[in-house]
Amino acid sequence: MKSIMVKYTELPREETIYIGGMFPVGKVSAVVANGGVGKSWCVLLASLSITKGVRFLPNEEYPVWNDKDVMVIDTENRAKTFCERVILAGGSLERYYVPGEDICSAITYFDKRDKESIEEEIQDPNTMMVIVDSLAGFNGGIDENTVAASESIKWLGRLAQKYNKAVVLTHFLNKSEVTNRINTENMRGHSSCQQYMELIWAIDKDKGSEKIKRLYQIKNNITEIDDTVYRFKLTEASAEFLVTPTAEETSLKEKRAKIFEANIDKSDKEIAELILIEEPTSYLHNLVAWVKRRRKG
């Protein structure tokens, strides 16, 4: 059990640091996916970049440490599993702790005293990251469309900004696919909390393999999926990234480019509809976003 009382002093604000290349310090971010895809595992592996000095995302430039701490607010009754995974991944249990509880316990209900305890311990200068697994559990099982979820994001966001910590939420996405419409109301709640939610990562299964996952960065406007897609296999103790695009993916990009160039004078939606004929499993709003980015160069 870890309980450290320190006097808080304002930390210097420099260029944003991204833990594991994914999670900005001083902001709230999230990983969303369907059940069993690997949200918690993904967040844990990314956190090893500050507790063990192991890089997560490939081909990305970001600093690493091997002596920073991670606070785990576990609401899924899985802190013991999280503990086992830390060991499996070769991390140190001394670097992971649940506020006010043993690492193998779990907080299942948050009242005023729990939040006071969290704020006391988050001030520890060695704590760099706070994992909230999950957003729904943190709100007592309430989904993301409620005022309670919005208020929780704002509360966590204020802590992230005040104490310069990376706060990461996991959230079960109740959708047929991650790339389905993810609107502003779903993860950001009211507009007043948008200043705290920096970005969202989404994971889904690769259509060609049950073992391969796809990791997307969802842009700030929420409906736009980033072109950058990381494909990886979750192994027993790590993630094996597949940085080389498949022939099918390369061919798909070439087809899109040809359709765009041949119809450049048409509207964004018209071009997207032509691409949709070749990609019937895609979503029109994502294709429109792709055309807009293509026009900007």
Please tell me what each predicted stretch does.
Residues 9-17, 112-113, 181-185:
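Short gly/ser/thr-rich secondary-structure transition/capping motifs
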Residues 1-92:
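The Walker A/P-loop phosphate-binding site
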Residues 19, 63-147, 151:
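Conserved inter-motif catalytic segment of the P-loop NTP-binding fold
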Residues 30-31, 36, 40-41, 63, ...:
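Phosphate-binding/switch region of NTP-binding enzymes
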Residues 44, 48, 119-122, 157, ...:
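A structural alpha-helix within SAM-dependent methyltransferase catalytic domains
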Residues 65, 123-126, 161-162, 207-297:
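C-terminal regions of RecA-like/P-loop NTPase motor modules
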Residues 50-53, 89, 138, 176, ...:
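Conserved, well-folded catalytic cores of nucleic-acid-processing
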